[in-house]
Design a protein with these regions (language model features):
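S-adenosyl-L-methionine
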Residues: 80-105
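A short acidic, Gly/Pro-enriched loop at the edge of an enzyme's catalytic core
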Residues: 103-114
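Repeat-blade elements of multi-bladed beta-propeller folds
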Residues: 229-261, 277-304, 317, 321-326
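Short loop/turn segments that connect beta-strands within beta-propeller blades
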Residues: 266-268, 307-310
Length: 326
C-alpha cells in the first residue's frame, strides 16, 4: 500500500507540475517574438505579459529594449520563470515576474506601451478588454492570442473577436502557424495638446490648449534621469517628451547627462533614445521642434531631422546659398 501511495503521489505531482508549466514547456515558433514586436510597434518602453509564457517572455526581453513585466496568478509558475530568467542572465531590470490576479491589473491608467497574452483560452475569463484598454497608454497596443490552439483554432478565434468587440476599437485578427491572435489599439487621448516649440508654438505664445491635465495634479511616473544639468528645454509631441540638457552641472551626479537630448515616453518615463549634443551647443533657445513623427534640431549649418520614436537620422534641411553656424 505504501508503494502504491507513493506512486500515486508522484503521478499527481507530475500532473500538477505539467499543468502549471504546460505553456512554457512548448517551444515557441522561431520568430514569434519578432512578429509580436513588429505588430506592437515598439522596441523600448514597458511590455506587460499576462500569463506565464516563459520562453516568449525571455525572448521579448532579449530581443528588444523593453522592460517586460509578467503577471500570473500562479505562484509556482512565477517562481519557475524567475529561476529561468536568472539562469538565462536576464536581470530584473529587463524582466520582472509577479504573482497576482488579472481582473484588476496593477498599472496606473495610460501607462503600458504593449500588452501581450498568449494563453487566451485560460485567461479570457479573468481578463476584460476594458481593463486592458485602461492600462494601455494612448495608441498603445494589446496582442491577445492562443498559442498552439490545435483543432480549436476556429473556436479560439471567435472567442477572441467577441472578447475584443468594443465600439471604440477596431480589432485586427490573424492566424498563423504559431496560433490565433487579435490586436487592439487604444484610441488617441482626446483633448491632449503638444508643446512643439520652446515657447509652445512658432508664435511664441506659451499657452497650452490641453484639456486633459487638470488640478489636482498627480505624479504620472518617476524615472531616470532624476537629476539633470542646466539650462534645459523640454518639448513634447505624440506622447513623447524631448529633454535638451545644457552644459552646466552643479553636482557630480549631473556630469554624465550634460549636452544631451533625452527622448522619453510621456506616459511611463522610459527612455526611448539619447543623443549627445556637440561641444558648445547652446540649448537655451528655440533650437528644437517636436512633432509626432519627426524631431527637428539645429545642428551647425543645417537642421537635422530625427525619427521621433527611435532617434535615427531621417535627413537634413539646408538653405541654399546661406552659410553660418547656429
Amino acid at each position: 500500500m505504501k508503494k502504491i501511495s507513493a506512486l500515486s503521489t508522484g503521478i499527481m505531482a507530475a500532473v500538477v507540475f505539467a499543468a502549471t508549466n504546460s505553456v512554457s514547456a512548448n517551444p515557441i515558433p522561431q520568430g514569434l517574438e519578432e512578429r509580436l514586436l513588429e505588430e506592437g510597434g515598439v522596441r523600448r518602453g514597458i511590455c506587460a505579459v499576462l500569463g506565464i509564457d516563459a520562453d516568449l517572455s525571455l525572448r521579448l526581453a532579449r530581443e528588444s529594449g523593453l522592460l517586460v513585466h509578467v503577471r500570473d496568478p500562479r505562484p509556482g509558475a512565477v517562481l519557475d520563470l524567475r529561476k529561468q530568467a536568472d539562469q538565462a542572465g536576464v536581470g530584473i531590470r529587463r524582466l520582472a515576474a509577479e504573482q497576482g490576479g488579472l481582473k484588476a491589473l496593477p498599472y496606473a491608467d495610460n501607462t503600458i506601451d504593449l500588452i501581450i497574452a498568449s494563453q487566451a483560452n485560460e485567461l479570457l475569463g479573468q481578463l476584460s478588454a476594458a481593463e486592458v484598454l485602461r492600462a494601455l497608454r494612448p495608441e498603445g497596443i494589446a496582442i491577445i492570442g492562443q498559442r498552439d490552439p490545435g483543432s480549436d483554432a476556429r473556436e479560439s478565434s471567435q472567442k477572441l473577436e467577441a472578447w475584443a468587440d468594443r465600439g471604440d476599437t477596431k480589432p485586427a485578427a490573424w492566424n498563423d502557424p504559431s496560433g490565433v491572435w487579435i490586436k487592439i489599439q487604444k484610441p488617441p487621448l482626446k483633448g491632449a495638446d503638444n508643446w512643439s516649440h520652446w515657447e509652445k508654438g512658432p508664435d511664441n505664445n506659451p499657452v497650452s490648449r490641453d484639456q486633459v491635465i487638470k488640478a489636482p495634479y498627480m505624479t504620472q511616473f518617476m524615472a531616470n534621469p532624476l537629476y539633470i544639468g542646466m539650462p534645459s528645454i523640454t518639448t513634447a509631441a505624440g506622447g513623447r517628451t524631448f529633454l535638451a540638457v545644457g552644459h552646466i552641472a552643479h553636482h557630480r551626479r549631473e556630469w554624465d547627462g550634460l549636452l544631451r537630448i533625452i527622448a522619453r515616453s510621456g506616459y511611463n518615463g522610459k527612455v526611448l533614445w539619447e543623443r549627445k549634443l556637440p561641444q558648445g551647443y547652446l540649448v537655451h533657445r528655440s533650437a528644437f521642434i517636436a512633432t509626432k513623427e519627426t524631431f527637428y534640431m539645429i545642428d551647425g549649418d543645417r537642421c537635422l531631422m530625427l525619427d521621433a520614436q527611435t532617434g535615427n537620422e531621417q535627413g537634413e534641411i539646408r538653405i541654399p546659398g546661406v552659410k553660418g553656424d547656429w
